[in-house]
């Protein structure tokens, strides 16, 4: 299982690539550099997974993974970022922006810090300057016919990967960032302008052409930055707007709001959120037909929406702050990482909206789905945590396959999967009791001979609710637990008054014993609740209120609920 998967590990001891997840993993490439002065600072795969690039503080090098054939090697010691163009025809490198020479020199100009190389022949193609590391990357159309980058508040568009002279220019006064749409032509570009004084912030979407016509627009207040995310088809745009300081002092995270622009209709809507609080994550499903939002004060909520911004499903609240879809969009992970040390991970079937399994992997700082959509890696990395660094491979059923630990002072920095094609969407299996018992981290005991040592957490039952001794089932069996009043009177004490229930700490008598509801009773209760909700919705319609599409759909299913309820109550 996962024998063909390839992954790269970068640590304080260098880096290596391996194929396979278990003990039989084969080393594909390895470079051991024990000195931090020559450690690997950055690596990257090409989009098709055939090439691997890295910088080890000596050179920047690109080679073929399958053959180890060197494609490019240049003396760039300070490379901090590496980017492959969408079709892997070009490589871009970024170095920190710096000015060389005497500080008193006149007309000082920084050295160009972004270089473009052709991977077909290894030749240097172009060079330009990018002052900010956060926004150095040019953005490309999928066919590489178009490249765009921002200079000041202007977006320059280039063709043929030549950054010496732009072909088109879009000017938006005060703009701070942009997002070029993926998908087939015509491409669109979204540009964000922060709020200034009484002037609201805005996002404008232009069609890329000589005239740059506006096809979408959204204005909003309380925003000094925005993250814009296109769906895979380039037809819808999510805008996560935020302001760093919450003037009401209710949130450490500032204030956030979420908007959606549909390019085909030109409509823009506010994405409705049922709970107040910060927005931790908003991500598109790779299929482009839905997106998930994690939001609200802890315990946080996760809601799924269709491309029109209408809620279609939400989960119960819990300790989570991120979501991750797998490559096929049929499994989504809802998790709490980073400052949520518990590391709870919930895997959901996207189509059926049912939870597959839930496990806990504490102190997780890095997560990555494998290209097959079934495996994933969890890591504890430096500098976030400098002790107990490790990486673990898992199957989506919650079963751990392998783990590797780094003893202090060794540090783990990064683990990434190699992109690979040839995998197809798979059917999600329904877990058996045995599958669930094999899920979770193995329990570690100081005593290696302890019977629970190395037993998966799923095999250990959670402690049940406390049952007072007088309600417990007798050890000899026979007879069920029940309240004292149900017991037969003791001979010789027939005239004794029955004992009154003893008050608890707050002076109130304890609640009487109630038997647990059966599955049929629970279903009937839920159906009755839905029928009552439908009655309220019908009354709102009679009063002339406008209902949401999902509320109208609920009303249409009234007969279905009544039919199911009648079957359960017969």
Curated annotation (Swiss-Prot):
User: For this protein, what is any one GO molecular function term?
Assistant: tRNA binding
Lineage top rank: taxon: Eukaryota
Query: What are the protein's UniProt keywords?
Result: Coiled coil, Initiation factor, Protein biosynthesis, Repeat, Translation regulation, WD repeat
| InterPro entries according to UniProt | TIF2A, TIF_beta_prop-like, WD40/YVTN_repeat-like_dom_sf
Question: Tell me, what is an example of a GO biological process annotation in this record?
Answer: positive regulation of gene expression
Which portions of the chain have biased composition (kind: Polar residues)? 493-518
- Coiled-coil segments: 519-541
Task: Spell out the protein name for this chain.
Answer: Eukaryotic translation initiation factor 2A
State the organism named in the record.
Caenorhabditis elegans
